[in-house]
Amino acid sequence: MNLIQIITTIILALFAACLLIQLLYYFLYFRKLAFFKDAGEISVKKAEMPPVSVIICARNESKNLKKYLEKVLTQDYPTFEVVVVNDCSWDDTGEYLDRMELQHSNLKIVTIKEQVKYRHGKKLALTLGIKAASHEILLLTDADCMPASELWLQSMVSSFAGQESHSVDFVLGYGAYQRKWGILSRMIRFDTFYGALQYFSFALSGTPYMGVGRNLAYRRELFFKNKGFGIYNHFLSGDDDLFVNMLATPTNTRIEIRPETFTLSEPKTTYAEWFRQKSRHISTGKFYKLKHRLMLGTLWASHYGIYLLGFLLLLVGFDWRIVVGLFSIRFITQSIVMGYAMKRLKEFDLVPFIILFDFFILLFYSILAVNNLFISKHKWK
């Protein structure tokens, strides 16, 4: 066996290993979301629903608040309040909130004044909002998010009202993006879907590791018992994923994927804006628990390996039909599982783009990773 044959054999073995790992993730984990059976319609009576505090942090969000706040304030729910933290806004956010407070008795405003000597991130605003909250159950969303229905609040917190509600501390929801024309919009939606496929599937498998602040519920008592965001208080990001990563367990976490539980946000309109947003979001991943880093690292390493090692096999003259055949096994499995999961999350129009975005997302995250090696500070707003 000459050197080329030895190298080819090694590359082929690694390629096969990456393929096997990918298939295992799809069959063992991702299929759980794809074929998940939810509880159907809400079985808990409205009178049995616990009081809820919705928390929204807003910095210069006047435009979005005017579009979406009313839909939050008028949810079909017996007892709830909406706490909006006006975090150092210099637009007309304050004036608009004052007007809305006169119209809605369930609106509570917390105002933070800017201090030149002290800069803070979203965690301070969120902490003050939670301190001002009157109720035990907290539902977090963002100023640029719109509930998908008037039953959003009922559906997201129904797990806190069932027979086993005492054991529930977290409910993870889906923060979707509105459908817009163009490749960027579809890529953002695919990236959001792929992230949700992971954190929902792993939660269903007994390994919850993150949630998104656009649609996340947890107990106020849990927040204060943990002394807020704990050891991550000084980090700019991580108000959602790191908090869940610290405290979520197989028994205290539920997911909600009924369409009425979704929130909808407008996607970024330029690649630069999306790049900055994602750069901030992924900066917290290195602080996840070791088992979660290994779990995600293995997934992404095998994902990269499929493309890189497949290319190397073609480069050394290996039979392209075998490479394409093996890659097709993964692609067919991926398309079936993702297709069903996309149908569950109302993203089925993305199915034709799976193979395209599957590759470009890898390139995008590679650039993000390199960028974050040289940028240590990120801004919330």
Task: Provide a role label for each language-model segment.
Residues 1-46, 372:
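N-terminal membrane-anchoring/stem segments of glycan-assembly enzymes
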Residues 31, 299-377:
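Membrane-embedded multi-pass helical conduit in multi-pass membrane proteins
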Residues 35-40, 61-74:
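Short, well-formed alpha-helical segments that are part of the catalytic scaffolds
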Residues 50-53, 81:
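Cell-envelope/extracellular polymer assembly enzymes that use nucleotide-activated donors
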Residues 69-115:
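Acidic donor-binding segment of Leloir-type glycosyltransferases
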Residues 92, 143-159:
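Acidic donor-binding/catalytic loop of UDP-sugar-dependent glycosyltransferases
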Residues 138:
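Short aromatic/hydrophobic "clamp" motif used to bind/position activated sugar donors
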Residues 160, 168-196, 221-224, 228-292:
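Catalytic donor/gating beta->alpha subdomain of glycosyltransferases that bind UDP-sugars
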